[in-house]
Structure formats: structure tokens, C-alpha cells
Amino acid sequence: MSDILFVSIGAILGANIRFQIHHKLGNLNLDKGFLILIINTFASFGLGLFLSLVEQFRAFTYSYQLILFFSIGFFGSLSTFSSFVYDLFDLCLQLELFRALKLFIISVSIGIIAFAFGLFLGTQ
């Protein structure tokens, strides 16, 4: 039961931070797809950094709970995969297949690069 609590608290924090970032960046009149890309890139980087740093805490008694809190709860909630999929679907419905493919390739590529960069920074 306590594992669910760690995931839930992390998810609450991640969702609220995502909301705040989206709200603040939305005031800049950026494209919705670009906002989602920024948030997902940040979450991917943070997850990579966290997972590289968590290795240093393996001996720590609560390392498993930290993993639940951050990797599943916080970063899982911070990223906006469902919004990303919705944008792809919406572009396909509008027959904007090239834009959908471009969004897919850019988002996945940047997400992987951001994750790897976070992982790399954490091991330095």
C-alpha cells in the first residue's frame, strides 16, 4: 500500500508542475505541439538524470520508494504522452501526415537525446 502512496504523491507533484509549465509557456503563445515537446523533453532529461543518480543511492534503505516516486509517479505524470498521441492523431485526421510524421520523429529523437544527456550528466 505504501508503494501506491509514493507513486501517487509523485504523480500529483508531476501533474501540477506540468500544469504550471504549460500555463507559463502558454502565455508566450507557443504552438501547443511545441509546448508538449518542451515538457516531454524536460521530463525525459530529468528521468535520465534521476536514473543515473539513483545508482548512488542503491544502499539507501528507501531507494525503491525513490524510484517509484520519481520514475513512475513524478516523471510519468510530468510527461504528456497522451497529449503527444492526441496531437499525432489530430494531425492524421486532418490528413497532415507529413506534419504528424515530423512531430513523431522530432519528439522521439529529442526525447531519447534528452534522456541520454541526463544519463550522461549524472554519471560524470
UniProtKB/Swiss-Prot annotation:
The chain crosses the membrane at residues 1-21, 34-54, 66-86, 103-123. Its main location: membrane. Keywords: Cell inner membrane, Cell membrane, Ion channel, Ion transport, Membrane, Metal-binding, Sodium, Transmembrane, Transmembrane helix, Transport. One of its GO terms (cellular component) is plasma membrane. InterPro entries: FluC. Na(+) is not transported, but it plays an essential structural role and its presence is essential for fluoride channel function. It is a multi-pass membrane protein. Na(+) binds at residues 76, 79. It is found in: Cell inner membrane. GO terms for biological process: cellular detoxification of fluoride. One of its GO terms (molecular function) is metal ion binding. It catalyses: fluoride(in) = fluoride(out). Signal peptide: none annotated. It comes from the Bacteria. Belongs to the fluoride channel Fluc/FEX (TC 1.A.43) family. Fluoride-specific ion channel. Important for reducing fluoride concentration in the cell, thus reducing its toxicity. This is Fluoride-specific ion channel FluC 2. It comes from Prochlorococcus marinus (strain NATL2A). The gene is fluC2.
